């Protein structure tokens, strides 16, 4: 993990033995099998989006388990893959178009660079084994990242899609921040509350109202 302004708050909050256990978990799992994302991208979300620049937090579940697809950013998918994109990112693009934003590619790195923390609750996944690392090591860390963002003074937007992410609402101070909850953008649930929820325009409205620059979701 590269040193960022997330580092010290995390070390202050987590148990003293957490980081040695985390390093042991990473070393062991990456030696034993095919794990995604690449080891140098595990913490890419907090490396690309410092706490001081974080305006929006989108919570995902875990990385894509297929080779070459996970980028260390929730929902982001390499632009080099033009076909067979995950249905969730396709539906996110549909909602963006509905809200007047035109984003043709599925790589969300430019969002992260604008202050959108694309945080998976579980940061690693074995090949073709979605959610297999849930409950192993990551949730104490990612829950604290959410709490640190919530405790920060600047108002933020927390976007929680689906039942898994919505459970994180209890970690967030709703009196200070905007919490946007909706169905997950997967095909099973997108038509039951994701489409038409307008998370992107609502986020920008809140940012402008609180004196912050809006996100260019088309990037």
UniProtKB/Swiss-Prot annotation:
Keywords: Cytoplasm, DNA damage, DNA repair, Hydrolase. Its EC number is 3.2.2.27. One of its GO terms (cellular component) is cytoplasm. One of its GO terms (molecular function) is uracil DNA N-glycosylase activity. GO terms for biological process: base-excision repair, AP site formation via deaminated base removal. The active site is at 62 (proton acceptor). It holds the Pfam family UDG. It catalyses: Hydrolyzes single-stranded DNA or mismatched double-stranded DNA and polynucleotides, releasing free uracil. It is found in: Cytoplasm. The keyword NADP does not apply. It is an enzyme of class 3 (hydrolase). Its main location: cytoplasm. Gene3D superfamilies: Uracil-DNA glycosylase-like domain. Excises uracil residues from the DNA which can arise as a result of misincorporation of dUMP residues by DNA polymerase or due to deamination of cytosine. Belongs to the uracil-DNA glycosylase (UDG) superfamily. UNG family. This is Uracil-DNA glycosylase.
